[in-house]
Amino acid sequence: MSHSVKIYDTCIGCTQCVRACPTDVLEMIPWDGCKAKQIASAPRTEDCVGCKRCESACPTDFLSVRVYLGNETTRSMGLPY
């Protein structure tokens, strides 16, 4: 199942999210916006299983990577749409 994965410019280029992803959804790409000169990218969101290990691994105060599960999460929790 595919999920929306967003990478924010608060990414510090640490690679923790990339290493945590069990389905290789994430990769690092060159970026001049941080000291590490790289940022996470999510080119294979169709492989995302929604485990959110990338979010858990992110060391920034504001999570630089977020997984949005969509309506199936709301349904599974029994909440109205």
Curated annotation (Swiss-Prot):
Subcellular location: Plastid, Chloroplast thylakoid membrane
Binding-site residues for [4Fe-4S] cluster 2, renumbered to this chain: 21, 48, 51, 54
Enzyme class, first EC level, given as a word: oxidoreductase
Annotated membrane topology: Peripheral membrane protein
Protein name as catalogued: Photosystem I iron-sulfur center
Domain 4Fe-4S ferredoxin-type intervals: 2-31, 39-68
Transport found in the keyword field: yes
Organism whose genome encodes this protein: Acorus calamus
Species lineage: Eukaryota, Viridiplantae, Streptophyta, Embryophyta, Tracheophyta
Function: Apoprotein for the two 4Fe-4S centers FA and FB of photosystem I (PSI); essential for photochemical activity. FB is the terminal electron acceptor of PSI, donating electrons to ferredoxin. The C-terminus interacts with PsaA/B/D and helps assemble the protein into the PSI complex. Required for binding of PsaD and PsaE to PSI. PSI is a plastocyanin-ferredoxin oxidoreductase, converting photonic excitation into a charge separation, which transfers an electron from the donor P700 chlorophyll pair to the spectroscopically characterized acceptors A0, A1, FX, FA and FB in turn.
